[in-house]
């Protein structure tokens, strides 16, 4: 019987969630806005670090289903990359297809959480995989 091997190619992100009463949207009809005064220093009530990104989330999901899973993506050599790699390792996702370089910066998101559960995401997209097209080719993908 052939064992399925999952290959997840794409983004991995470190997320930081900031929540609290300071994020209270003002609504104009059905559209709500968060108004943050420039120059203010705001205190948040909640701080949570996590990891995500489409390919990383898929890889973790498959690994939790006891499928052999490999992640291919570009990461920097920064604290966000360390968090991503630690989480993938904890979840038993193979990272032999990861390319890490000081010339890249790992994707990073700051998620502002309103008490209602609504969120606003500030996202820095790291190096696009399209900048390394040779990273994913048939020679790098092993299978039956």
For the regions a language model picked out, list residue spans one by one.
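Short hydrophobic segments within beta-strands
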Residues: 9-12, 72-74, 113, 122
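Conserved phosphate-binding/catalytic loop of the ribokinase/pfkB sugar-kinase fold
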Residues: 96-101, 111-144
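Glycine-rich phosphate/adenosyl-contacting loop at the front of the ribokinase-like
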Residues: 1-70
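Short secondary-structure boundary/capping elements
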Residues: 47-57, 80, 102-103, 128-133
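A glycine-rich helix N-cap at a beta->alpha junction
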Residues: 87-104
